[in-house]
Swiss-Prot record:
Gene it is expressed from: SYCE1
Name this protein carries in UniProt: Synaptonemal complex central element protein 1
Family from the record: Belongs to the SYCE family.
Biased amino acid composition, Polar residues: 1-10
Region (Disordered): 1-31, 267-351
Pfam family, one: SYCE1
Key words, A-Z: Cell cycle, Cell division, Chromosome, Coiled coil, Meiosis, Nucleus, Premature ovarian failure
Subunit relationships: Homodimer. Found in a complex with SYCP1 and SYCE2. Interacts with SYCP1, SYCE2 and SYCE3. Interacts with SIX6OS1.
Nucleus keyword on record: yes
GO cellular component, one term: synaptonemal complex
Function comment: Major component of the transverse central element of synaptonemal complexes (SCS), formed between homologous chromosomes during meiotic prophase. Requires SYCP1 in order to be incorporated into the central element. May have a role in the synaptonemal complex assembly, stabilization and recombination.
Amino acid sequence: MAGRSLTSKAEPTAGAVDRAEKAGGQDTSSQKIEDLMEMVQKLQKVGSLEPRVEVLINRINEVQQAKKKANKDLGEARTICEALQKELDSLHGEKVHLKEILSKKQETLRILRLHCQEKESEAHRKHTMLQECKERISALNLQIEEEKNKQRQLRLAFEEQLEDLMGQHKDLWDFHMPERLAKEICALDSSKEQLLKEEKLVKATLEDVKHQLCSLCGAEGPSTLDEGLFLRSQEAAATVQLFQEEHRKAEELLAAAAQRHQQLQQKCQQQQQKRQRLKEELEKHGMQVPAQAQSTQEEEAGPGDVASPKPLKGERPGAAHQAGPDVLIGQEDTLHPDLSPRGFQEIKELF
C-alpha cells in the first residue's frame, strides 16, 4: 500500500514540474515585454515609431494579458507547488516514519530469529541431555541388576558355605564325641598292649638265641670244625629261619603300629586344623562358637597325646612316641648286634 501511495503521489509532482516549466516560459515572455517597452521608449525618443504604435500597443496589451494569465497560472502553479511540496514533505516524513517502522520490524525480526535460534539450541541441548539421562538411567539400571545378581550369588555362596560349615561342624562334633574318643583310646590301648607283648616275645626269643650262641661259642671259642658242623646243622638253620620269621613279623607289626599311629596323628592334626579354620570362619561371620565345642577343645589336647603308648620302664616319657618304628628297630639292632640283618646274611653264606 505504501508503494501504491508513493506512485499515486508521484504523478502530481510530475505535473507540477511541467507547470513550473510553463511559469519559466512566462517569465521569459515578461522579460521580452520589458525589452519591447524599452525599445518603444527608445523609438519614441527618436520619433520614428508613429506608424507602428498601434501595433505595438496591441502587442503590448496582448503581452500584458498573456502576462496576467501567466501570472495567474504562476500563482496557481505556486499554490500547486506549495501543496505538492507540503505533500512531498509529508511523504518524506511518512517515508522516514516507514523507514523507522521497517528498521524496528527488522530489529524485531532479528531478535525473534535470535530467540528462535536460542530456543532451538536450548531444545537441542535439552534433547541431548534427555538422551544422556536416559542412557545413564539405563546404565544405572544395568548396574543395579548386576549388583543384585552379585548379591544374590554372594548370598547363595554364603548359604552354601554356611551349610558346609554346619556340616563340617557337625562332623567334627560327631568325631569329637566322648564315646568315640573312648573307643579310639580303648583300641589304641589294646593295640599298644599287643605290641608290647609281641615286643617282649621277640626280646625273649632274641635272648634265647643269644644265650644259645654264647653257650655254643664258649669262653675260649670253639673249634672251627664244631662251629662249622653246628652252623651246617638243621637246628642252626631252623633257629635262623625262626629268628628271621620272628624278626620279620616284629618289623611288620612295628611298621603297622607306627603307620597307624602316624595316620591317627595326621588325621587328628587335620581335624584340629579344620576345626580351627571353621572356628575362625564362624567368628569372622559373627557367629559364636558353641560352649560344648569350646569344652571339647580343652579336652582334646590332641589325639596323639591320648593315643600315644605308655613309655617302657627306663625310657623317657614320649620317647617311643617321638622315635617311631625306626628307633625301635635300631634299639633291637643295638641290643643284639650279632643278630642284625648282616649277621643273618653271614649265617646264610656259611650255610
